[in-house]
Amino acid sequence: MITLTPGHLTLPQLRRIARESVQLQLDPASFAKIDAGAKAVADIAAKGEPAYGINTGFGRLASTHIPHDQLELLQKNLVLSHAVGVGEPMARSSVRLLMALKLSSLGRGHSGIRREVMDALITLFNADVLPLIPVKGSVGASGDLAPLAHMSAVLLGVGEVFIRGERASALDGLRVAGLAPLTLQAKEGLALLNGTQASTALALDNMFAIEDLYRTALVAGALSVDAAAGSVKPFDARIHELRGHRGQIDAAASYRELLEGSPINQSHRDCDKVQDPYSLRCQPQVMGACLDQMRHAADVLLVEANAVSDNPLIFPDTGEVLSGGNFHAEPVAFAADNLALAAAEIGALAERRIALLIDATLSGLPPFLVRDGGVNSGFMIAHVTAAALASENKTLAHPASVDSLPTSANQEDHVSMATFAARKLADIADNTKHILAIELLAAAQGVDLRAPHHTSPKLAPVMETIRSKVAHYELDHYFAPDIAVIAQLVGERAFAKIAPFSFASEQ
């Protein structure tokens, strides 16, 4: 059980919500603020004075006054008309994050929503009745309207859900959770729809995957150093301290620890090779830069996870209703775009190491990592797959945040495209996962070919894990299943756990 304290969510909590089947409860200390916000909205609605989002239309229709007897219909119509998403359902892990983030935002008491509505969301979450949310349809301002409308429609008994993974109607989902359809009061539909929770949830979910890939890449890169008989001297702490970048210093420390005590490394200490290619030698510089970007993105996304991104905002102490633009997800878009650059570079560097290993001139290993070359092609086309994926990532890493299209009759004339920025991270991460799987296979093959010398004590479990699933490559065979099984292990964090490094979300 995780207790949500609105405004005080942590990255480890968010990772657990995404990756584990934890249940949620709201911190009782938030109840007074929630109730005060709901009362403030009820008082404003009762007075009948125009207040945006409470008794007016929305967007370009904000100047249209809505009579008191139509306020409930206004909120219902808002939810139903905005549920226009298309595409595949959002991943379960992202939906769980989305719901938790929405609860945190509402729980700060500036949205004017009743606890009854929040309790219904928590009940659905804990019953594993998750809204089916199409992943496409948001431009990241005014908030993630379409995705959040699909979440909210379930509370009305409209739309679809997944009941413990099985697709069903919203009404069936409510019944399983012991709930009845809600009637939303003034502003409650808008409070549910307005916010950056979809883009932030997608960005966080994919960030956690990219963090795991980063750690896996440290391990794969270190194993490639041994496979290529590379030097550990470029990882000397003194080099990196002189430059001063925190990420670079930390990455170099990881490589030193992973390669410490390697008999392969000891076997060529006195060779006449002066410098390794950049894909080996400059790993701390490249991976360190990626790490710095990822840490910054985590900081931004944690702030956003704890933010109130509704509009308008209710200030119960003064009774004021202030319209602003906290729904504009530009910070999320920038963070996601930076994560895309980091994830693409992780894959790009790994692809270069694969290319090095299969090149006999550079690695000193048999061409394409197979002894009987010619009749056997070895890793030749596995590298081509890695190159294809790395190239695809370069296009996917193009920043989404530099694009904008005006919507709502030019009332909403600049948007963030944060949801797309966050969503495409999943494709980049999947490509990078498979590149790393190919590198791990190639590096393991290279280490085998260094016999009788073997790799370091820290990397020995990596070899054992790989060889428990895929045998040493002796002859050409149907190769795709080998890549698939190692990619699955990468996704299960089998190699990430070996890296002597952890992110804030794992603390």
Curated annotation (Swiss-Prot):
Q: Tell me which positions the record assigns to the signal sequence.
A: none
Instruction: Name the major location.
Output: cytoplasm
Involved pathway(s): Amino-acid degradation; L-histidine degradation into L-glutamate; N-formimidoyl-L-glutamate from L-histidine: step 1/3
An MF annotation (GO) of this entry: histidine ammonia-lyase activity
Q: Where is this cross-link: 5-imidazolinone (Ala-Gly)?
A: 141-143
Keyword field: Cytoplasm, Histidine metabolism, Lyase
Q: What post-translational modification information does the record give?
A: Contains an active site 4-methylidene-imidazol-5-one (MIO), which is formed autocatalytically by cyclization and dehydration of residues Ala-Ser-Gly.
Query: Matching InterPro entries, A to Z?
Result: Aromatic_Lyase, Fumarase/histidase_N, HutH, L-Aspartase-like, Phe/His_NH3-lyase_AS
Which CDD domains does this chain map to? Answer: PAL-HAL
On the tree of life, the source organism's domain of life is Bacteria
Q: Which GO terms describe its biological process?
A: L-histidine catabolic process to glutamate and formamide; L-histidine catabolic process to glutamate and formate
Reaction it catalyzes: L-histidine = trans-urocanate + NH4(+)
Stored SUPFAM superfamilies:
L-aspartase-like
- Localization per record: Cytoplasm
- Lyase among keywords: yes
Q: What residues bear 2,3-didehydroalanine (Ser) in this entry?
A: 142
Cellular component terms, GO, for this chain's entry? Answer: cytoplasm
Give EC number(s), comma-separated: 4.3.1.3
**HAMAP family per the record?**
His_ammonia_lyase
What name is this protein filed under?
Answer: Histidine ammonia-lyase
- Its source organism is Burkholderia vietnamiensis (strain G4 / LMG 22486)
Name the gene for this chain: hutH
